[in-house]
Regions:
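Binuclear metal-dependent hydrolase catalytic cores
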Residues: 1-107
């Protein structure tokens, strides 16, 4: 039997929660929560098509800024999904930046 996906926790059980799911045949991946993503190399982050955030406590959302830096400017869009109020919270994070050096990107 061929394995279609591989789910891997990014951190140890006591670290910030992040689950990376590689959809092998589709050449893309899913992220569940954005805690500490420092252990994921950029090549893996660039495969992510969807991010599912359970809630925006710091331990589940602290990696958002790092994720944004890696994927900003790529051609493919990314779907961010979260609970009630999530869109407003992401909007506030994006508005907190000064965007004068990224004028060529659509955010």
């Amino acid at each position: 039997m061929r394995q279609l996906l591989e789910a891997s926790p990014v951190n140890d059980p006591f670290g910030y929660p992040v689950l990376y799911v590689d959809l092998r045949d589709e050449r893309r991946a899913l992220l569940f929560d954005l805690g500490d993503i420092g252990a994921l190399p950029p090549r893996k982050l660039l495969r992510v098509s969807h991010v599912f955030v359970s809630h925006t406590h710091m331990d589940h959302f602290a990696g958002f800024d790092q994720f944004l830096r890696v994927v900003l400017g790529r051609k493919e869009g990314i779907v961010l999904l979260g609970g009630p109020g999530f869109v407003d919270q992401v909007e506030h994070k994006l508005r907190a930046y000064t965007w004068n050096v990224v004028h060529r990107y659509s955010v």
